[in-house]
Amino acid sequence: MESKFIVIEGLEGAGKTTARDVVVDELRRHGIPEVVFTREPGGTPLAEHLRTLVKEGVDGETLTDRAEVLMLYAARVQLVENVIKPALARGAWVVGDRHDLSSQAYQGGGRGIDTHLMQTLRDTVLGDFKPDLTLYLDIPPQQGLERARSRGELDRIERESLAFFERTRARYLALAAVDETIVTLDAGQPLEQVSAAIRQALRAWLASQEAQV
């Protein structure tokens, strides 16, 4: 089977780190020899600098919504071209903590940035490059934020209003409903049930991929 790009998406507190561990474990059980993990924003020296700016902001300066989304796409193109595509080319599988769907949901939905601009940015930066599978961990914003707060200090994005995350979730769900490569999973369940659902979804998808070979 050819190398694949799998992405884990969701709001704060959805359990993406746990999901990553489950996915990597399942891929290794399946005999995948090399699995590369990435996160967005981040993953290259420049992208990590941009991550800090997006997450923490700049003292004394308001970070505008458009500046935010442009930095996210700058970080994304660095990661895709310097890490993800080379890994896939050598036969490795890539598991990403967030990708373009995050921008479409957070900046397009949460921030309310014009849909045409979001599509233009995506098409310009990524072209036809997209994940083979996205696991969207759906969780009510209030529940997710409570989990995030329990981890400690919140970053600039995590401090947004509940209404912001409601809009973000709504956009996630709308996009997932029209894209067959996105699998929506109930992340509000107990951890054991979520992990089991991830394994089941991934195994079913792997079986479908093997059937196409």
UniProtKB/Swiss-Prot annotation:
Its EC number is 2.7.4.9. It comes from the Bacteria. PROSITE patterns: THYMIDYLATE_KINASE. The keyword Nucleotide-binding applies. Keywords: ATP-binding, Kinase, Nucleotide biosynthesis, Nucleotide-binding, Transferase. It catalyses: dTMP + ATP = dTDP + ADP. This is Thymidylate kinase. It comes from Edwardsiella ictaluri (strain 93-146). The gene is tmk.
